[in-house]
Amino acid sequence: NAGGKIAMQILHAGRYAYSDKAVAPSSLKAPISPFIPSELDEEGIENQISDIARSAHLAKAAGYDGVEIMGSEGYLINQFLVRHTNKREDRWGGSYENRIRFPLEVVKRIRKEVGKDYLIIYRLSLIDLIPDGSSWAEVVYLAKKMESVGVNIINSGIGWHEARIPTIATSVPKRAFSWVTKKLYGEVSIPIIASNRI
């Protein structure tokens, strides 16, 4: 009654999935899972994009005001972005343009599925806290790309789950990572949400 909105988060764990059916951009075991994921082939990648877009369609049909795409914290979409987990040499890996193809295709497909007026939030990893993570220039570039393909709001993702630096424990000071969100101000014209120990 107060005018609030509710969005459903769409998350694919990728190599973090606790299952022998886990899939990822490359067959690399995560340090926080005992399972080695299978590398997605072209058909598998297309199926993942279609499934995520269908999830957005179902969220809209169920009455949600929007969706948040989990593109951070080391989950599947984030795994495509960085060399740490993406060792592919096809059009989904190698150059940064190729590595961002998966998240961009996800957003484009969702926008096509839900229409131009539906809320899309993208949780973008602003700081990975792992070896071979995204550079700041890459983060800014992807944020701008996300805005250009129809994202309405960027939510700040801080650190991968396998990172050795705590980000949400009660020992972490309040607003400890809000400086990273502030650093992105001015780079995009859409709203940015700060997160972690707020």
Predicted regions span which residues?
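Flavin-dependent oxidoreductase catalytic cores
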Residues: 1-198
